[in-house]
Amino acid sequence: MSRNSFIPHVPDIQAAGGLVPMVVEQSARGERAYDIYSRLLKERIIFLVGQVEDYMANLVVAQLLFLEAENPEKDIHLYINSPGGSVTAGMSIYDTMQFIKPNVSTTCIGQACSMGALLLAGGAAGKRYCLPHSRMMIHQPLGGFQGQASDIEIHAKEILFIKERLNQILAHHTGQPLDVIARDTDRDRFMSGDEAVKYGLIDKVMTQRDLAV
């Protein structure tokens, strides 16, 4: 796919409400207008903002796959500001990040909590960042189910399986022992940027652009 290929429109943030700035580019072929997020996508920048849910996850996955097709060797930059959300939606993003050829650099802007923190930690080693006043939080998955006792038991086993799997992923990316992860995710564990670096959740707190890759 060529560098001049169609750049897909990014409607998720626009749909969240408010006006999205437009950028007009001029060339010998005339003018072309982009919403700001589609223009940033041309620079291989993806925004993951708000609750992690199926629609948003599908858009992020589509953008990751598109940028891989554009250039499988060049890094992708994923900016995260999310309180977390659906485990299955988040895992679709995580698995795609690990699946594609380009390195995915992750940066927390604001907050990366719950599934947002796992996606932040799942970035390419050495390329996981946050801004100075960002907050990160890890915890165990939340679940609630009503129904027959046998169905409740089935769902309880599934939640415990998901909890163990998420802990294994965090242990892999942070370098922390699995028992430490299990202890720390038993309740909400908030971290500053410096604390997240020490924990292994990220690699560096960015204060200026030239500190990033």
Curated annotation (Swiss-Prot):
Name of the protein in its database record: ATP-dependent Clp protease proteolytic subunit 1
Enzyme class: hydrolase
Gene Ontology process terms (BP): bacterial-type flagellum-dependent swarming motility; cellular response to antibiotic; protein quality control for misfolded or incompletely synthesized proteins; single-species biofilm formation; single-species biofilm formation on inanimate substrate
Record keywords: Cytoplasm, Hydrolase, Protease, Serine protease
HAMAP family xrefs: ClpP
Organism the protein comes from: Pseudomonas aeruginosa (strain ATCC 15692 / DSM 22644 / CIP 104116 / JCM 14847 / LMG 12228 / 1C / PRS 101 / PAO1)
InterPro entries associated with the record: ClpP, ClpP/crotonase-like_dom_sf, ClpP/TepA, ClpP_His_AS, ClpP_Ser_AS
Origin: domain of life: Bacteria
This protein's encoding gene: clpP1
Subcellular location: Cytoplasm
Self-association and partners: Fourteen ClpP subunits assemble into 2 heptameric rings which stack back to back to give a disk-like structure with a central cavity, resembling the structure of eukaryotic proteasomes.
Pfam hit, one: CLP_protease
Gene3D superfamilies documented for this protein: 2-enoyl-CoA Hydratase, Chain A, domain 1
Cellular component GO terms held in the UniProt record: cytoplasm; endopeptidase Clp complex
Annotated GO MF terms: ATP-dependent peptidase activity; ATPase binding; serine-type endopeptidase activity
Similarity section: Belongs to the peptidase S14 family.
EC number: 3.4.21.92
Catalysed reaction, written as an equation: Hydrolysis of proteins to small peptides in the presence of ATP and magnesium. alpha-casein is the usual test substrate. In the absence of ATP, only oligopeptides shorter than five residues are hydrolyzed (such as succinyl-Leu-Tyr-|-NHMec, and Leu-Tyr-Leu-|-Tyr-Trp, in which cleavage of the -Tyr-|-Leu- and -Tyr-|-Trp bonds also occurs)
Function of the protein: Cleaves peptides in various proteins in a process that requires ATP hydrolysis. Has a chymotrypsin-like activity. Plays a major role in the degradation of misfolded proteins.
Keyword Hydrolase on entry: yes
